[in-house]
Amino acid sequence: CISARYPCSNSKDCCSGSCGIFWTCYLRKDPCSKECLAP
């Protein structure tokens, strides 16, 4: 995880990928607008 914020669609869905373990995933109204934010 290099960027502090990015759409999951650009990185294999951070919610289920390795980023999700350390980062927090936020679900927007649009399921395709998930975002992982650094803790």
Swiss-Prot record:
Signal peptide residues on this chain, from the entry's feature table: none
Tissue specificity field: Expressed by the venom gland.
GO function term, MF aspect, one: toxin activity
Annotated compartments: Secreted
One Gene Ontology cellular component annotation held by this UniProt entry: extracellular region
Disulfide bonds: 1-15, 8-19, 14-36, 25-32
InterPro entries named in the record: Spider_insecticidal_peptide
Annotated Pfam families: Toxin_21
Keywords, comma-separated and alphabetical: Disulfide bond, Knottin, Secreted, Toxin
Its biological purpose: Causes paralysis to insect larvae (H.virescens). This toxin is active only on insects.
Recorded family membership: Belongs to the neurotoxin 13 (insecticidal toxin ABC) family. 02 (Calisoga) subfamily.
Domains: entry comment: The presence of a 'disulfide through disulfide knot' structurally defines this protein as a knottin.
Protein name in the entry: U1-nemetoxin-Csp1c
Lineage: Eukaryota, Metazoa, Ecdysozoa, Arthropoda, Chelicerata
